[in-house]
């Protein structure tokens, strides 16, 4: 029997296709060269939670019911990790989830900044995540949770720390005799919701301060020069 391939799904948040290039994202370009590259693909939902729901279920947002942010993934729908578990894979999720909390206050589950209940973790065996990562962290420093709800603090640039949690799984957290499916979900380059701007890596401010915007955004003045990082 042929050895089954390991799978790493590296997911960024609110990122345009034309921001992936050798200058800005050389490591993502390297992953694309060494991994599987889909050159003609599209998200079926422009909104954060619904787009994630589509990825985790394989169906449209109107089918799974997550058609807007703040609608938890229905427990009646079989999630992606279930099929990998059935196929003998070890499954892991690291980063932002955004599929467990209800939008309306006082109704349903609210775990935006608290542990995601086990039954709402999409059947991933290994869990290092927060439902709304921008509520538990800023560009630098914060916390996530393990699968049992234990708080895990981190210090440093958030994207780097999420990568470190993923590396920790690869080095010591996985079942070594199984192939693995690892879903890494970054918040970056999404803006920081509680003060409405993107917190970039401090060391890159001078490097990218005059980086040209995509042509269709040049007429929008915005405040990115003032608010980065």
Locate the predicted segments by residue.
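Extracellular/periplasmic catalytic domains that process cell-envelope and extracellular macromolecules
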Residues: 1-3, 32, 85-86, 119-122, ...
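Catalytic-site neighborhoods of secreted/periplasmic enzymes
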Residues: 57-156, 192-206
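Short alpha-helical segments and helix-capping/turn motifs at coil-helix boundaries
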Residues: 111-113, 163-172
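Active-site segment of extracytoplasmic enzymes that catalyze sulfate/phosphate-ester chemistry
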Residues: 5, 9-10, 16-94, 102-104
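Aromatic-residue hotspot detector
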Residues: 38, 123-124, 180-181
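Phosphate/oxyanion-binding active-site loops and adjacent basic polyanion-contact surfaces
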Residues: 158-162
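Active-site-proximal cap/lid insertion segments
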Residues: 2-5, 11-25, 132-157, 167-229
């Amino acid at each position: 029997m042929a050895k089954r391939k390991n799978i790493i799904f590296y997911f960024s948040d609110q990122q345009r296709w034309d921001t992936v290039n050798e200058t800005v994202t050389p490591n993502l370009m390297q992953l694309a060269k060494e991994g599987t590259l889909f050159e003609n693909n599209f998200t079926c939902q422009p909104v954060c939670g619904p787009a994630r729901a589509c990825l985790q279920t394989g169906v449209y947002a109107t089918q799974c019911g997550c058609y807007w942010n703040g609608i938890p993934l229905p427990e009646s729908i079989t999630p992606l990790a279930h099929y990998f578990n059935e196929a003998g894979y070890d499954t892991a999720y690291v980063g932002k989830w955004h599929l467990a909390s209800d939008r309306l206050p006082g109704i349903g589950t609210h775990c935006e900044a608290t542990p995601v209940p086990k039954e709402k973790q999409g059947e991933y065996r290994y869990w290092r995540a927060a439902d709304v990562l921008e509520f538990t962290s800023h560009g630098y420093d914060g916390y996530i949770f393990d699968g049992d709800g234990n708080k895990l603090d981190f210090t440093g640039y958030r994207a780097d720390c999420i990568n470190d949690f993923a590396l920790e799984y690869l080095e010591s957290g996985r079942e070594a005799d199984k192939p693995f499916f690892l879903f890494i979900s970054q918040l970056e380059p999404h803006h920081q919701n509680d003060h409405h701007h993107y917190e970039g890596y401090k060391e890159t401010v001078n490097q990218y301060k005059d980086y040209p915007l995509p042509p269709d955004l040049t007429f929008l003045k915005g405040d990115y020069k003032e608010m980065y990082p």
